[in-house]
């Protein structure tokens, strides 16, 4: 059993696994002053929109949007064996992840299902040497920063606490907020606020930076398909940072509604909808999260079950659908080929960028080829649909020159 604690010093064994009452975010008052419409989501009161979902969606695609994602769980796993222990639970290569680099990964169940998807960063600190003492610079204690889904964080913490060894420590960074600055002008705006900090950063780089008295972790990543940054900040400074960023002409606050339509266009799955404990990484088209060497060698929870799917092929696959007309297909809509049901929609909506309905669905593997003509049932009507490659809108991550 892993040693674990929250930043305030509480042992996580005393934490409630589920939150019955709706919580508020550190920026709750800030959102309300900005005119946000607040709704319950993942146990928190969160802004679904400010000016309007389509306006905010298009602004993010054209300029830069600021999202409050403080509901998500920020965790730190530390200890000499941290990478080894995480590799028992995650199918990606953690030990080879270089300091300052981030990787998308999956928390796996023994059944081969997905307990959650997450981002993991090698946060091992560099300790500067001291010429007077004759000490050389060196890497400190191994540390891995993880961002998990808000609705699953308590389950994730319990799972990690149960399966990680006593030699590592799990810390829940409850006293930190998380802001995401996304869009083609995100770097321009952030560079104006924090000069020379992000100049050399590419997609999935992560740095620690003291902005005055604010200790920040800045990671070049996001959930929109655009270039952008996720900024972990002490909760007490979150409002001041949000004000500084929104003072830039390119930046506006953006709500959950646009976040969902942006990630749908980007072909990014939403946990609890497009991926669940009942879906495996192969069927979910997340094979890239299974590092080749670890896919072959195993040693991680769920490997045997996933290996069988890899060998036999998945029964269904997650695909994109472009739907004719203007009527969006929502989660649960059935997919047909003639009279035969061949799938089900897991996410769907109207794409402001493409100006047409799009969806993600699981369909029978034999019908998962790009260009396959299908039908989706919406309000008792069959709408023509075509299997499409994802992302629907090309990603614009900054990968360097």
Region annotations inferred by a language model:
Residues 80-116, 186-214:
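Internal amphipathic helical hairpin motif
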Residues 73, 77, 115, 144-151:
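Short coil/turn segments at secondary-structure boundaries
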Residues 2, 7-40, 47-48, 123-401:
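Conserved, structured C-terminal
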Residues 119-120:
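Glycine-rich, Trp-frequent "lid" loop and neighboring beta-strands that shape
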Residues 2-105, 113, 124, 257:
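Acidic, proline/glycine-enriched N-terminal capping motif
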